[in-house]
A protein has these predicted regions:
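Alpha-helical transmembrane segments of multi-pass membrane transport proteins
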Residues: 1-179
């Protein structure tokens, strides 16, 4: 980004100071999110939320597939509204213990989680990658949505395949570990 700024706009002290101020503000917001997520995680651990969530799942008689479908829906909705870092910090402490307790592989869930957040990056209204593409290429929102829709559909099909056939995402890590 720095090289692009230098090539296209030149390097001036006014631009550097503005960039430093903006990056400081962005980093401050990120640090507040991380600190808030740390306290949120601590409260979740202290309140034993993961165990209580597991008990709710058992009491409702939800099958593991219904649980993962519910988690996928929650992550997709959150991906439309919140950035991936915040989603990760807020949901991982809740979902990972539940996933392990119902018998899913945590590596597989990690892949499913990343695919969900990738989908969130290209899903309106909060898709961060959409804002970046719209800004860089100066295209209309309609044109952008028309261009991203096929990729969004492919990602959703890919997510469904990974959920239906976990071996697709576990084969490579298994060969790396030697299993």
């Amino acid at each position: 980004m720095l090289i692009i700024a230098i090539v296209f706009y030149g390097l001036r002290w006014k631009g550097i100071s503005k960039s430093l101020i903006e990056s400081t503000l962005v980093n401050s917001m990120i640090m507040f999110i991380i600190v808030g997520a740390y306290f949120f995680t601590y409260m979740i651990g202290s309140a034993n939320i993961a165990t209580k969530l597991h008990d709710v799942v058992v009491n409702f008689g939800l099958s593991p597939w219904q649980v993962i479908l519910s988690i996928n829906i929650i992550l997709l909705v959150l991906g439309c509204l919140i950035d991936p870092l915040t989603i990760t910090l807020l949901t991982v402490p809740i979902f990972v213990p539940l996933i392990i307790q119902i018998g899913y592989n945590p590596i597989w869930f990690g892949v499913v989680f990343v695919i969900n957040t990738e989908i969130g990056l290209i899903t309106p209204p909060m898709g961060i990658n959409l804002f970046a593409i719209k800004t860089v290429f100066n295209i209309s929102t309609g044109e952008l949505l028309k261009g991203v829709t096929p990729f969004l559909m492919i990602e959703i099909v890919f997510l469904a395949l990974i959920c239906a056939f976990p071996a697709l995402s576990l084969w490579l890590p298994g060969t790396m570990i030697g299993g």
